[in-house]
Amino acid sequence: MAKLEFNVDMERDNKLLFRKEINYTIKFENDKTPSREDIRKLLANNYGSDESLIIVDKNRQETGKHEIKGYAKIYDTKEHAMLYEPDYELFRNKLKVKEGNQ
């Protein structure tokens, strides 16, 4: 993983849905764009959380810029993530595996 510079743009506790919501900016060197997995690891390290509790919802990158603006959610428990997140988000973030994929 390349050197990543992580900044929190906005953070709020959503007590109703048992999660923390984070808008962030990640700047990276002249290398490939960080994957969702890389971003989940970065968030887990910064927030002292388990990767299985983190949902990387959106990432937006402008062409030619080495910067990502994104939105992620950190749940209190995996059960809350499974309850409130749609299946496609759980599959994207590897919290749920499609049947038949080995």
UniProtKB/Swiss-Prot annotation:
GO terms for biological process: translation. InterPro entries: Nucleotide-bd_a/b_plait_sf, Ribosomal_eS24, Ribosomal_eS24_CS, Ribosomal_uL23/eL15/eS24_sf. It comes from the Archaea. The keyword Ribonucleoprotein applies. Keywords: Ribonucleoprotein, Ribosomal protein. The keyword Ribonucleoprotein applies. One of its GO terms (cellular component) is ribosome. One of its GO terms (molecular function) is structural constituent of ribosome. Belongs to the eukaryotic ribosomal protein eS24 family. PANTHER family: 40S RIBOSOMAL PROTEIN S24 (PTHR10496). This is Small ribosomal subunit protein eS24. It comes from Picrophilus torridus (strain ATCC 700027 / DSM 9790 / JCM 10055 / NBRC 100828 / KAW 2/3). The gene is rps24e.
